[in-house]
Amino acid sequence: AGHQMQTSLFIKPLLKKYFPKWTKKDTIDLSLTILQNIESLHKSNVIIGDLNPFNIIIKSSKTVFFVDTDSFQIEHYPCPVGTVNFTPPEIQGKDYKSFLRTKKHEYYAVATLVFMILLPGKPPYSQQGGTNPAANIKKMDFSYPLGEKTNKKTPDGTWRFIWSHLPFYLKDKLYDVFKNNKRIEVSHWIDLLTRYKHDLSKGHLTNDLFPSDFK
């Protein structure tokens, strides 16, 4: 048995119920476990296509399962389904079964999943005055600041605090993906999150999942 990511990790009261002892380090371990699984699928030329938290079952931070694998894209069989928040701008609104996904499309979904594990359950394009997610994705209207660069629509409260506590090298890459459309390979995320885990272990950064103030 295990817990569906969407209804355990991504809902704060349920996160505290199912994983009461988890800290940032556990969610980074979980991210690394998922990324290593995705990387090995990519090496076998399999694209998940509909990567999303409803299709990931968490047994522990080191053991996860993908479900709905019948929609995986294998060779010339397209993945016929998708999820708005995990669909990159260039294929928003397209008929999923009418084309083949590329790894570049999947790298967008991977970055979204990483973001939503770092800020548990918060999609990257949700913002104050929240307009339509698909529209925000198409415009790449990303609301989390990088230095002075901001659209001043960052969601209030805990989300701002979590973002402020992330190391610059992670914020920089997330900003690059969601504002500048520069995606990185799965192996690069593995390197960045391994570095983050190391920095957490040194006590340089907060291990709280929901810090209550800015860094």
Model-assigned labels for residue ranges:
Residues 124, 165-171, 177-188:
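A conserved short helix/loop substructure at the end of the activation segment
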Residues 54-94:
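Activation segment/activation loop of eukaryotic-type protein kinase catalytic domains
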Residues 91-104:
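Conserved end of the kinase activation segment
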Residues 38, 42-59:
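Catalytic-loop of the protein kinase fold
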Residues 114-168:
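Conserved C-lobe activation region of Hanks-type protein kinase-like domains
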